[in-house]
């Protein structure tokens, strides 16, 4: 701690960020690291033994191909095979018609690159077209002999396909890491966290982590549906299980048992609830659908309401009473292309900008006859992202990974290479480098590309097309400079040529999240099966919506073409909306425990006041006309007297509404007026 206290605050924050990113714990990460590590060592052994060129390309195939589970790895392997066929076919067409004519070659290669970038952004299988765009764009200009060009192109088939076969053998056939196993482990981990917060007074986890865990469960559910027949047969029950576990995990994260009176009835009820959650854990671990015969007694229902756990209890019991053979709801098949693929000009502009950046880099390195920096063209394709903020993020990751890889390559060449005599020693030295790269590459999606870029840059500088000791430091310099040049050119193009800013999209994204929250408020607050299932599904959608808004805020913060004050004001308001939206969701959860005691006819009217106010606020976000909602709670007749607990909970919701930012003000100021009907 003393060492950290002596560091500047930005450095401490950076170290904390990387610690959070790189220490991610998720099911399947350790097997993925081992598969990637062993695969890299086998690629080096095979390439050095049979003198196969372009070893860096083979390593890149592994890093992009080996995924967190066997099904995903198999799916990506199929895409790589298709991409290799398309890529080699397009290259041969370019050679056949335009090898001796550089201008014609550019005229043909340009539309191919544009088409790939357009489809990468608009098609579901965008990874295929990304691979076609990134492969072999510079080979025709790098060599003067047609026969050598053809041979190297044929080598590309081997370079692309044998790592694909290798990762299929390792990750799919020999040591498969099944999605169903990861799902069982993830569900049990989430329930462990929930029980800990139920029984002990713990600090709540960050909401961003809760949302990411919820999204991870949804992704695993998709893989389980595609990979496991038993899961598909009982998919309705398992999807309800995932939704229930997500709800219990996210709700109990903010639960503090010390804030309620510890009567004997409440203590016994919590123990009973924890016991039922443990039974669910055991059933999930065995891959069985959990069934429960527990019914709430009158005393348990009172205790559950007193400690604000009745809704969680009812949700859990409905899962335990659900028929495992309930037929699933048919899922709608998503379209292959985005809806506005041929009407939105941003997609074609995106392709044109990428082509323009590549042409500038091609003209530069061809004009100065400096073929070693051809990585600048690859950089233009790799960092091409839909908007300015995400492009800058990718540029930082690529530059950071390239810098680390270049430093490792320099140290390796100067300090280690002179002492190596055989392939065994080489593999022993490369093992920790590849293990480090695999560990980083399997971390959070926001920073994983650093590991891939580090290993590829290291291989380009030390292992590319050499099958013995090499001491050429020029390669290290050229690869690093090529990446820097490509990054600078791309930054200039994406900033000043049709910049796709998310500053206007962010308020619309926030409005969508708040609109979803208003739908939650319109669901009748009754312990009825259909209402609860709808409520849980929309809640999961809210986790995804708030997480997407949070990530968009981070990207907008990088858009330096915007006015600094306007950007800071937009981000501050947006983060306030996200924070208040999360608080409103949890506060509304608390009202479910008391609202069911109201008359059914009265409930929708009261809930409708909140939903209407939130929808009105969301509608004004796009035009910056939203003001903090002021809600007046209607008086209830004596015959329909509202419970004191519910009144206090709804007053708290009113206070949260009043703290939503006023977008018409010139600067973000805290709300000065208290919401009507609210109490401090």
Swiss-Prot record:
Segments passing through the bilayer: 43-63, 75-95, 100-120, 125-145, 155-175, 399-419, 423-443, 454-474, 480-500
A molecular-function term among this protein's GO annotations: transmembrane transporter activity
Gene Ontology cellular-component annotations: plasma membrane
Key word ATP-binding present: no
Pfam family, one: FUSC
Topology in the lipid bilayer: Multi-pass membrane protein
Any one Gene Ontology BP term: response to antibiotic
Cell compartments where the protein resides: Cell inner membrane
Keyword Isomerase: no
Domain of life: Bacteria
Keywords assigned: Antibiotic resistance, Cell inner membrane, Cell membrane, Membrane, Transmembrane, Transmembrane helix, Transport
Record-linked InterPro entries: PHBA_efflux_AaeB/fusaric-R (IPR006726)
Residue ranges the record marks as coiled coil: none
Main localization of the protein described in the UniProt heading: membrane
Subunit structure as annotated in this protein's UniProt entry: Could be part of a tripartite efflux system composed of MdtN, MdtO and MdtP.
UniProt function note: Could be involved in resistance to puromycin, acriflavine and tetraphenylarsonium chloride.
Family according to the record: Belongs to the MdtO family.
Protein name stated in the entry: Multidrug resistance protein MdtO
Gene name tied to this protein: mdtO
């Amino acid at each position: 701690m003393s060492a950290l206290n002596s560091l500047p605050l930005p450095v401490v924050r950076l170290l904390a960020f990387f610690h959070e990113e790189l220490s991610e714990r998720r099911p399947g990460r350790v097997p993925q690291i081992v598969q990637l590590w062993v695969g890299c060592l086998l690629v080096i052994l095979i390439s050095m033994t049979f003198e196969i060129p372009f070893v860096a390309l083979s390593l890149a195939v592994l890093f992009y191909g080996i995924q967190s589970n066997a099904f995903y790895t198999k799916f990506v392997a199929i895409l790589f095979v298709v991409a290799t066929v398309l890529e080699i076919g397009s290259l041969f067409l370019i050679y056949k018609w335009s090898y001796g004519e550089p201008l014609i070659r550019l005229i043909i290669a340009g539309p191919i690159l544009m088409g790939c970038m357009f489809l990468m952004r608009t098609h579901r299988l965008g990874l295929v077209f990304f691979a076609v765009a990134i492969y072999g764009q510079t080979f025709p200009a790098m060599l003067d002999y047609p026969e050598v060009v053809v041979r190297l192109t044929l080598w590309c088939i081997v370079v692309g396909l044998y790592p694909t076969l290798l990762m299929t053998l390792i990750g799919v056939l020999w040591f498969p890491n099944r999605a169903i196993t990861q799902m069982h482990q993830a569900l049990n981990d989430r329930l462990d966290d929930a029980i800990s917060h139920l029984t002990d007074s713990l600090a709540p986890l960050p909401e961003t982590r809760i949302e990411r865990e919820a999204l991870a469960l949804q992704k695993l559910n998709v893989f389980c549906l595609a990979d496991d027949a038993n899961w598909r047969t009982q998919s309705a029950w398992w999807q309800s299980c995932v939704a229930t576990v997500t709800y219990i995990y996210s709700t109990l994260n903010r639960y503090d048992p010390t804030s309620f009176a510890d009567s004997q009835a409440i203590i016994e009820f919590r123990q009973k609830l924890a016991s039922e959650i443990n039974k669910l854990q055991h059933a999930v671990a065995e891959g069985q659908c959990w069934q429960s015969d527990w019914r709430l007694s009158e005393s348990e229902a009172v205790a559950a309401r007193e400690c604000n756990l009745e809704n969680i209890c009812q949700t859990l019991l409905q899962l335990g009473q659900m028929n495992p053979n309930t037929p699933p709801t048919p899922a709608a098949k998503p379209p292959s292309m985005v809806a506005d693929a041929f009407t939105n000009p941003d997609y074609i502009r995106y392709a044109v900008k990428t082509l323009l950046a590549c042409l500038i880099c091609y003209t530069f390195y061809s004009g100065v006859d400096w073929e070693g920096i051809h990585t600048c063209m690859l950089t233009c394709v790799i960092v091409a992202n839909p908007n300015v903020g995400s492009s800058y993020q990718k540029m930082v990751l690529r530059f950071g990974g390239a810098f680390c890889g270049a430093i490792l390559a320099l140290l390796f060449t100067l300090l280690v290479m002179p002492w190596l005599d055989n392939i065994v020693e080489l593999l022993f030295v490369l093992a920790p480098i590849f293990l480090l790269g695999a560990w980083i590459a399997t971390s959070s999606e926001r920073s994983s590309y650093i590991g891939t870029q580090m290993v590829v840059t290291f291989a380009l500088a030390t292992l590319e097309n050499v099958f013995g000791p090499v001491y050429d430091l020029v390669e290290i310099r050229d690869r690093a400079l090529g990446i820097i040049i490509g990054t600078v050119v791309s930054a200039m193009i994406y900033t000043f040529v049709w910049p796709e800013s998310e500053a206007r999209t962010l308020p619309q994204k926030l409005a969508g999240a708040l609109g979803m929250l208003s739908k939650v408020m319109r669901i009748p607050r009754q312990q009825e099966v259909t209402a609860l299932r709808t409520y849980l599904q929309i809640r999961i959608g809210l986790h995804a919506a708030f997480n997407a808004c949070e990530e968009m805020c981070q990207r907008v913060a990088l858009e330096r073409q915007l006015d600094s004050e306007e950007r800071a004001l937009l981000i501050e308001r947006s983060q306030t909306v996200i924070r208040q939206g999360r608080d409103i969701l949890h506060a509304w959860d608390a009202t479910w425990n008391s609202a069911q005691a109201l008359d059914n006819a009265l409930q929708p009217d009261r809930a409708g006041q909140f939903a209407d106010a939130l929808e009105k606020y969301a509608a004004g976000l796009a035009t910056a006309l939203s003001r903090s909602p002021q809600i007046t709670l209607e008086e209830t007749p004596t015959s329909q007297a509202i419970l004191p607990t519910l009144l206090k909970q709804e007053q708290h919701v009113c206070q949260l509404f009043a703290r939503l930012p006023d977008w018409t003000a010139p600067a973000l100021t805290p709300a000065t007026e208290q919401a009507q009907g609210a109490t401090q």
